[in-house]
């Protein structure tokens, strides 16, 4: 029974990877909307775009690592 619960927990933790993809889409979509409204300010916001994408991807990687730990270490 304990092994099955670890697999269920890993599956639930893997949902965070999908949530990271949604977060990256939101960040990129909002950047694109702002760049289309004000093209002259788009170049100065590129660094902020990459920082936002990096934070969203980091959360997805952490969720993936938790899923792997639940699958193989517990």
Curated annotation (Swiss-Prot):
Designated name of the protein: ATP synthase subunit c
Pfam families: ATP-synt_C
Function as written in the Swiss-Prot or TrEMBL entry: F(1)F(0) ATP synthase produces ATP from ADP in the presence of a proton or sodium gradient. F-type ATPases consist of two structural domains, F(1) containing the extramembraneous catalytic core and F(0) containing the membrane proton channel, linked together by a central stalk and a peripheral stalk. During catalysis, ATP synthesis in the catalytic domain of F(1) is coupled via a rotary mechanism of the central stalk subunits to proton translocation.
PANTHER family membership: ATP SYNTHASE LIPID-BINDING PROTEIN, MITOCHONDRIAL, ATPASE PROTEIN 9
Site features described as Reversibly protonated during proton transport, chain residue numbers: 57
Residue spans crossing the bilayer: 5-25, 49-69
Membrane topology: Multi-pass membrane protein
Listed GO MF terms: lipid binding; proton-transporting ATP synthase activity, rotational mechanism
Record family assignment: Belongs to the ATPase C chain family.
Organism encoding this protein: Roseobacter denitrificans (strain ATCC 33942 / OCh 114) (Erythrobacter sp. (strain OCh 114))
Major location (coarse): membrane
Domain of life: Bacteria
